[in-house]
Amino acid sequence: MDNQFIFKYSWETLPKKWVKKIEKSEHGNRFDTNTDYLFQLLCFLKLHTYTRFQVLIDICGVDYPSRKRRFEVVYNLLSTRYNSRIRLQTSADEVTRISSVVSLFPSAGWWEREVWDMFGVSFINHPDLRRILTDYGFEGHPLRKDFPLSGYVEVRYDDPEKRVVSEPIEMTQEFRYFDFASPWEQRNGNEG
């Protein structure tokens, strides 16, 4: 079975309310789904005889601040039996919680924690939803587009104290004037 057959079969077999949009391309096929049907759709794709997408390759997040549901969560699946790949996408806002798929794909635990840590997307029924890449005292979610580029707190290891310390960033100046004239050029006009 080829990738297009699996995609077409899935589309014809699935309840239509589970899928908002489909996209077929040579780079891979994609289903867009509502968060309410994400778990059921993943169950179908993993367990059905003609799909067998039993490997969850990755879960990643994307932030589109101009959208009402600004966060997109992307699930990349692989069927080793049919040598086929597919993507599932769902969207959420700051308060929408997505069903955890750890019970279906145990490896999802790490990726869901990463999406929560970096974007702030929360997962219902996750067994251990805590920070994975940033420090426990870290405030905010650094891959959001509205996250400040330069923070106000510096976290560093203090060797004499033998511990991690947080302190306000010390900026020596607020504004720096750049003079683009070369210091080797004479300024009095007597060049040459």
From Swiss-Prot:
Catalytic activity as recorded in UniProt:
a ubiquinone + NADH + 5 H(+)(in) = a ubiquinol + NAD(+) + 4 H(+)(out)
Record keywords, A-Z: Electron transport, Membrane, Mitochondrion, Mitochondrion inner membrane, NAD, Oxidoreductase, Respiratory chain, Translocase, Transport, Ubiquinone
As recorded in UniProt, its EC number(s) are 7.1.1.2
Give the record's membrane topology. Answer: Peripheral membrane protein
Molecular function terms from GO = NADH dehydrogenase (ubiquinone) activity
The text of the family note is:
Belongs to the complex I 30 kDa subunit family.
HAMAP family listed in its UniProt record = NDH1_NuoC
Record note on quaternary structure: Complex I is composed of about 45 different subunits. This is a component of the iron-sulfur (IP) fragment of the enzyme.
Record's protein name: NADH dehydrogenase [ubiquinone] iron-sulfur protein 3
**What's the gene?**
NAD9
